[in-house]
Amino acid sequence: MSSKAEKDIKWGIAPIGWRNDDIPSIGKDNNLQQLLSDIVVAGFQGTEVGGFFPGPEKLNYELKLRNLEIAGQWFSSYIIRDGIEKASEAFEKHCQYLKAINAPVAVVSEQTYTIQRSDTANIFKDKPYFTDKEWDEVCKGLNHYGEIAAKYGLKVAYHHHMGTGIQTKEETDRLMANTDPKLVGLLYDTGHIAVSDGDYMALLNAHIDRVVHVHFKDVRRSKEEECRAKGLTFQGSFLNGMFTVPGDGDLDFKPVYDKLIANNYKGWIVVEAEQDPSKANPLEMAQIAHRYIKQHLIEN
């Protein structure tokens, strides 16, 4: 029997399993209608916006046909590179789109200096670091984003991410300490913190009260070790199978889920796994994830 906390959680799956925004050639034959219909078949309630999604009118039409919702959308922030004013203009346009499709959160990652799309950088060793001055600017800018988002009924969900200046627990700690809890929330991503730090519970335990959005991404530890040994890029690592959906890798999601439930988390948990759809059938992977969630989390 589901608890009230469980009923406050919506389950989604990200479009990245069907098509990848960073490598457009991957899954290019998977169109919006196929993606959304697969999500319904697999049993999920919604998805996040992919780079190939249409404008609000067309998207809302396709969503309504299938009784699906949008959980959020990634925003590439360039506060350091462009300055707060210019970056905020782009973010406000992003919020206008999100409001039009009834999304609850704006997923934000500061992308200045990122190596996640690099063809050469070792994702395990070459991450960028911000100076103290840059940290101050990012935190100030994110607070401003939070003010903008609030005008549109949205929350900022900051995404700690491999290959960026805010990747580790230590860096996320600093971000949380220097931003306003009313304005900046945390997107907790199991896979990114597991690969970055090994321990994926410490970050959640430290900042559970700031979590406004969740990504459930599994990790194949043997593939991770292989990718580390080869010094692969981020894209090379996920094409090599480092990430997968819950139930197909080595992470235990039960303590994560139990922690969220115990703290009355309200919001989306989105299954996300960067994979090559030609090797990992998106619908099959979505069904594996849904089965795992139902059997090992909700009904356990």
Curated annotation (Swiss-Prot):
HAMAP family: IolE (MF_01672). The lineage of its organism: Bacteria, Bacillati, Bacillota, Bacilli, Lactobacillales. It catalyses: scyllo-inosose = 3D-3,5/4-trihydroxycyclohexane-1,2-dione + H2O. Its cofactor is glutathione; Co(2+); Mn(2+). It is an enzyme of class 4 (lyase). InterPro entries: IolE, IolE/MocC, IolE/XylAMocC-like, Xyl_isomerase-like_sf, Xyl_isomerase-like_TIM-brl. Its EC number is 4.2.1.44. One of its GO terms (biological process) is inositol catabolic process. Coiled coil: none annotated. Gene3D superfamilies: Divalent-metal-dependent TIM barrel enzymes. Keywords: Cobalt, Lyase, Manganese. This is Inosose dehydratase. It comes from Lactiplantibacillus plantarum (strain ATCC BAA-793 / NCIMB 8826 / WCFS1) (Lactobacillus plantarum). One of its GO terms (molecular function) is myo-inosose-2 dehydratase activity. Pfam families: AP_endonuc_2. PANTHER family: HYDROXYPYRUVATE ISOMERASE (PTHR12110), INOSOSE DEHYDRATASE (PTHR12110:SF41). It comes from the Bacteria. Belongs to the IolE/MocC family. Pathway: Polyol metabolism; myo-inositol degradation into acetyl-CoA; acetyl-CoA from myo-inositol: step 2/7.
